[in-house]
């Protein structure tokens, strides 16, 4: 793959997540009954950051859960016979809550669909929102994000890589081109 561009640096990521945090509280009319669920892998630290921002400006803690969607994916045969199943940890009852699913990139919509299936198996939320740092387009399913850090129109030959300090050692969003594309 060939590096093309930096789409967001650390301060830009922070500002986007801070804005998303405000938009979430505004849409929910406060923090009552609100909870965040980060999708493995990079959605988890993003969800925790959004929760910290909400706690900063609202003075109230918002619970955060962790969701593994591996067994809900529709491409298991394409990713190998031994998928790596990680922990799902949602330390609160979903029933009646406004849940914000948090992921790094929205592309085809298949990850979000799998996350919705997994969540609904765990309870019956009052409302489910989707928050993403980057929406790159190219939907294959009728899914859209409610909260978006940055819309980045891409070609199918391009790859958006989100790096987060907690996983990758730095905060940065990059655009890459697949070789031979």
From Swiss-Prot:
Gene3D superfamilies per UniProt: 3.40.50.2020
Annotated keywords: Glycosyltransferase, Repressor, RNA-binding, Transcription, Transcription regulation, Transcription termination, Transferase
Motif PRPP-binding boundaries: 99-111
Gene transcribed to yield this protein: pyrR
Record-listed E.C. numbers: 2.4.2.9
UniProt GO BP: DNA-templated transcription termination; regulation of DNA-templated transcription
Pfam families hit by this protein: Pribosyltran
Stated name of the protein: Bifunctional protein PyrR
Protein species of origin: Thermus thermophilus (strain ATCC 27634 / DSM 579 / HB8)
